[in-house]
């Protein structure tokens, strides 16, 4: 019952149980009031004015709502629920249109919020469909500014300011809440239809019915004013789930990009691109709205970030994704010998693949070796659901994982495997290297505390305020903010205290104390436990669990942390695997970062799950005075000359499968590898990596 140019408008006004005006819908409160009236444009006549209360699931009203609307929870308790009210709305509008001999209409609302931020999100959460008429509407503020260009900007308009501009009455006390608003909007429309303006309603706003998938090229230009980052998503959420979270807003085609971590798994974040900046600004108002039981954080992002995640250059991927409106399923764990026929046979006739073999995309390494991943296209949701039922069924001798995917995830996975260089290049070190002025804690004395569950926006000042009087007991440079692999706050921090007693007191006093809107857990720990957590282990009041990179035997007894030279810290942590040194050797070494070595009899992949930010102390932010002479001593300190460090390990990723010892030694020509050790190297081959073993120490390349 809609058209691009209708003879009738339905002026619509609504209110929720929470915020009013410019913040309507920003607090997720439910709709409690709808008021509407039909306006016949050719005859300039109006139909009956209707007002309906809506019974919300939560009848608690905000103070602002009670004050502005005059409504009570008792009155709303007798009203009909939203789905019944919307049915009545359709029936009453149809009856009013028959009086004027019309059969089509378009909604007209005061701004975008009622339609986009209230009606669409709420009906989506309550799992019922809106009528087609709610997918097209006129924004009275935009139409007014088009008719009267000298009026205030669209974002500053209200019903009252528009009425004042036209010299109309603005005494709201004369009418019930909602009735005055609709009558005034009708009067504004009639003024716009007068001979002086002769305004024509021809270009309505539209709401997309569903999210459209599609590829994104790295050569595209993406406006940074149209991109947001959503954080805190359930790991199993798909692009359709995210589109549903932003229901009512127009997402660009292929505009949902789920982010992956270094292991290729989703990290709970997504970048979303909208059709324009206005839609993006409305999306930012959904900060901390809920997806199920989880609240989702929404922040601004840039076009470069979106292209980095969603953009691709492969013609094969572009052709695969060229089939629009397909459901994408990712298969993981395929046998390396699996063929297209094997995959089609595994899926079976109950879930036919779009285009047969053309609907399959195998992920391969640059040299053509399969990775065990594949993407599959299905033409409808039913076929995709049938495929997902085969999750962890057996193909060959392996179980296969199946889960929903997106066009952006296809690009990310292909980019990750296809763009790996044969010999990764590390950043050129700065000469001379300036050692960092701090050392990460080691030792078994439990003089540290761990803060877990910090707000992502929390800074050093917030942590020091949180600790209160205990700030005076923090060691110099003893505040360590922990960052994740994307360089963002992880919600953790480590604090080095002056003694174990001080750490115990802080843990007892501050545990589950509130910081902003979150409670923070505080655990006492040692420097060794702190480093274990940084490597991926877990620490809570039940104890410490080892990181996945260490075996239980390696965890059975704490070792002295290995020390690598300060200049090595310029490289990415994944590129360095140091061995342990004797206490005598490390005592004279320059300041260093800390890792844990593998056992003498075994080699485990040593990686860092989190990275500590440069630590600070209360002295650096003005909480405590620095010790006398500390600044002068730091300024006059001489840097230790760089000396060869025995036992350092260097990791090389992406080696060609047929790389020999001669090629590796040639690559390191000039780095003074001891000639006596050449004969002691033994090459161990595996499909994904190469390891060189020396008789006296491990070397991982």
UniProtKB/Swiss-Prot annotation:
Gene3D superfamilies, per database record: 3.30.70.330, Ribonuclease H-like superfamily/Ribonuclease H
Transmembrane segments: none
One GO term of the biological process aspect: RNA splicing
Stored InterPro entries: ESRP, Nucleotide-bd_a/b_plait_sf, RBD_domain_sf, RNaseH-like_sf, RNaseH_sf, RRM_dom
CDD domains assigned: RRM2_ESRP2, RRM3_ESRP1_ESRP2
Occurrences of domain RRM (ranges): 226-303, 327-407, 448-523
The entry's keywords: mRNA processing, mRNA splicing, Nucleus, Repeat, RNA-binding
Gene Ontology terms for molecular function: mRNA binding
Keyword Nucleus belongs to the record: yes
Cellular component GO terms held in the UniProt record: nucleoplasm; nucleus; ribonucleoprotein complex
Subcellular location: Nucleus
Main localisation: nucleus
Superkingdom as given in the UniProt entry: Eukaryota
Similarity section: Belongs to the ESRP family.
Role summary: mRNA splicing factor that regulates the formation of epithelial cell-specific isoforms. Specifically regulates the expression of FGFR2-IIIb, an epithelial cell-specific isoform of FGFR2. Acts by directly binding specific sequences in mRNAs. Binds the GU-rich sequence motifs in the ISE/ISS-3, a cis-element regulatory region present in the mRNA of FGFR2.
Protein name per UniProt: Epithelial splicing regulatory protein 2
Name of the gene encoding the protein in the UniProt record: ESRP2
